[in-house]
Amino acid sequence: MCGNSVRENRESPQPPAGNSGPAGRAEKAKSRKLAMYGCGQSDNSTLPTKPLNKMADATAEAVEGRELTKENAGQQNMPRTQCRTKGVPSALERVRQAALRSRNERFSALFHHITTERLEVAFLKIKQDAAPGVDGVTWEQYAKDLNKNVENLHLRLQKGAYRAKPSRRAYIPKPDGRQRPLGVAALEDKMVQRAATEVLNAIYEVDFLGFSYGFRPGRQAHQALDALAIGIRFRKISWILDADVQGYFDSIDHNWMVKFMEHRVSDKRMLRLIKKWLKAGVIEDGKWTASEAGSPQGASISPLLANVYLHYVLDLWAHQWRQRHARGDVIIVRWADDFVVGFQHEEDAKRFHAALHDRFKKFSLKLHPEKTRLIRFGRFAQRDCRRIDGRNKPETFNFLGFTHCCGVNQNGKFQIRRITMKERFNAKLHGVKAELRKRMHQSIAEQAKWLGSVVRGYFQYHAIPGNWKILGAFRTQVTRMWYKTLQRRSQKSHLNWERMTKIANTVLPPARILHPWPEQRFAATIQGRSPVR
């Protein structure tokens, strides 16, 4: 969604600089890694959280999610030199400020921001158990001599001797049963890509429009879901174009990609680095294949490149189209290559759909014929679908794992109902069942610990208002599968369902709503600065 300024977004703090001292890098790598990622892998809450009691530097503004005051408590006793140092913006903050001052500014000196400290921080953010690339180097092996390895990598980057390695082709199952191809990059490629992404984000987080949410720092899927729900409810929306780009990551045109990057980046070394990653190719079954188009899905740089490509191909064009050609209200919410456009008038929706098809064709993209639909949806859909379409109820659409339906609240007013997609629900249960078979001979305590984390992570994303029945059904099904697994371990099992229920109530979290209503969270996020558009 967008407001008074469609470019308005929330900036996220820069990651802390790594320890630049020559001693202790390798020894601290593992402990710092665990400290960074000791929390769960579920989506974080978008609401501000309170700090720990012993955090001395916490302020009221930080707790409440507000901006800092000009002079915080305790700042009067701070040495004057330290005060001046804290007020000096970081190098990337100066880049961000320059990008904000001029939308036409082209940056010619970015490559030097890929420092040894930034490379080390990038290394520590990589999962220790991440699959190795074509070179077979693992996180543990690289950490044994981290200082020397990082210095050597940085030296090769500065000399121009760095060579991007091909990605190793791997496949993961999709919810529809097909296989999704992934490109597993080598460890050093991941480090450099993460560092380059951090540098480039200082520019593009200023440029990206407000209705773009996917793979952006400080933005989460639930913010996109909230923005969509608010837009449909409070704007005059009667039609929804649910769109998906077919094979997007494999269809990115390399020439157009470089041209788009050159709008903001004139640093030849940075552009050369991006070209190396695009042309590195993939290795599958020992055979190297050149990359004529696309960016490997799974590479650390790919989400940023994908967002830049659609920023120029879709976002800027769509925002201009609704300002110049739309007769009624138009809302847009995009998450990577999956986006939803809402319209007040059917003729606007049809003209936009046709123009979008031609626009994508110019840049080697194509809308997925099965996943792209134009449906009647909104506050008047229930009335019009019976009178005009002869349907008993409006159609539904899927977005970010939830099926969106037209409904009413307790007062009889229009409200969007969001429930977990049936395909996602069944796929998750199927995965839990398969994993339980592998863990059949583990102790009950070990199984309980794992299942508790699974259910907790599922609730963390899916526990939205109106989805309580799905949460309860998921917890019940997990308990039943666990019960059957324990019974299979012994033919003389004395475990009955009543006792199993008591065990489950002890170790599995109860089904309860964890997320607020979209109106509450969206209002807290924008803080009244921009209306829904």
Give the location of each predicted region:
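Non-catalytic terminal/accessory segments
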Residues: 1-533
